Amino acid sequence: MVSNSSLDERATAVEIGGLVDGVGAPVMRAAYALRSKPSWITLSSVEGTGNSRVDVTAPVYKGREGRSGSITVSVEDLKEDVAIQQSGSNIWDVTTQSLAFVKTGEAKKFTGNTNLASITFAVDSDASNWLTAGKLVVATKQYNSGAAIEGDPGASDVYSFEITFTAAANPTVSIRTGHITVNGQKYTVTQAAGDATLSVSPTSLTFAAAGETKQISITTNTAWTIS
């Protein structure tokens, strides 16, 4: 997974002070209450009396765009707001690191989770003669490479996606290797070697008594011998 910020929970203490008398000592005169907090914030206490420290905890956040809010501390008819902000991050967490196809050809899915606004994908030139890319699928909706994801779900959370790649049958006796590029990152694709093929024509020869030369045609995808 690639992320540009840490995703651990963070707690910040908010100090709440009482009034101060003429010699500088705190005077515990007023009760306080914390109100109007964002739903994603947890407070260790929402009310108390006098000088206090309250832990303000933000949970793991997987959105791409930051979020903000505030909490309000009230003492009698006095109010003070504390601004709260949590940074977003770019998340790219793929469950597929490579794709391996059988010799007869098949379709396989490249899957993962991300919060990007769009995803680019393509078959590289070293595999373009035998591999094709389908559509990007997010929540049953299909998208072309680079198209914006409807509703931008990644702004506030990760979403799952899949891209289907289809390999044609391998007509050679060699393993085929190439690459796909998804979100600017290269991933390896391979295909098992195909079966050897052989066709000979004609399959019988008849020669004149005086002798003559005739030809047979050999069609194959690998080395051959005659015995």
Model-derived features: where do they sit?
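Solvent-exposed, low-complexity, repeat-rich "mucin-like" stalks and linkers
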Residues: 1-33, 90-125, 196-226
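A short beta-strand micro-motif common to beta-rich folds, especially ectodomain repeats
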Residues: 14, 54, 64-77, 163, ...
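Surface-exposed binding patches on compact interaction domains or structured appendages
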Residues: 24-55, 93-94, 116-164, 222-227
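Short strand-coil-strand connectors
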Residues: 37, 74-78, 115, 124, ...
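Surface-exposed, short loops/turns at beta-strand junctions within beta-sandwich domains
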Residues: 60-66, 157-159, 168-175
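Short beta-strand segments
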Residues: 78-82, 92, 108, 185-187, ...
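Interdomain boundary/hinge segments at the C-termini of tandem beta-sandwich modules
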Residues: 82-89, 189-195
